[in-house]
């Protein structure tokens, strides 16, 4: 009986450890390609905020863009990306997109990517946007 108890205990322990391993993988760092795409989107969002004069846009788009920048950074820090590494990637993306014309298509693709990648991303952006001003 004692041997059966040990065997069940170790089986249960292995299942728990395996489950924790799988769960930690799900919450782990963004993949390299997703991180690059996130940075690119942050660059697009920042370019939206600093649109050159003469560009047509909705004010709400600027709010959503800035809220999205904040949500991406919060998420990056949550999954273990160092703040300095995140900021370096953001700076490169901002340099790439700064001064570019507004692209509704690119902005909407970034919103879709954020919502698909970040748990509760849409709600998080909405919540942050409500606190901006």
Residue locations for each model-derived region?
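Compact alpha-helical subdomains of small soluble proteins
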Residues: 59-133
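Hydrophobic alpha-helical segments
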Residues: 16, 35-39, 107
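Classical Sec-dependent N-terminal signal peptides that target proteins to the secretory pathway
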Residues: 2-29
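Generic detector of short alpha-helix boundary/capping microenvironments
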Residues: 16, 29-30, 50, 98
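Short N-proximal segments of mature Sec-exported proteins
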Residues: 30-81
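Generic cytosolic/nucleocytoplasmic N-terminal low-complexity/intrinsically disordered segments
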Residues: 1, 5-7, 34, 63
């Amino acid at each position: 009986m004692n041997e059966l108890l040990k065997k069940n205990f170790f089986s249960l322990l292995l299942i728990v450890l395996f489950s924790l391993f799988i769960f930690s993988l799900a919450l782990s760092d963004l993949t390299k390609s997703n991180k690059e795409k996130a940075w690119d989107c942050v660059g697009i969002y920042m370019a939206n905020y600093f649109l050159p004069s003469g560009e047509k846009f909705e004010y709400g788009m600027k709010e959503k863009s800035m809220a999205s920048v904040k949500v991406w950074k919060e998420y990056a820090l949550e999954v273990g990306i160092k703040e300095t590494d995140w900021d370096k990637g953001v700076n490169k993306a901002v340099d790439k997109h700064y001064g570019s014309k507004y692209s509704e298509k690119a902005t909407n693709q970034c919103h879709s990517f954020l919502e698909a990648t970040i748990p509760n991303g849409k709600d998080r952006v909405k919540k942050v946007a409500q606190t901006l001003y």
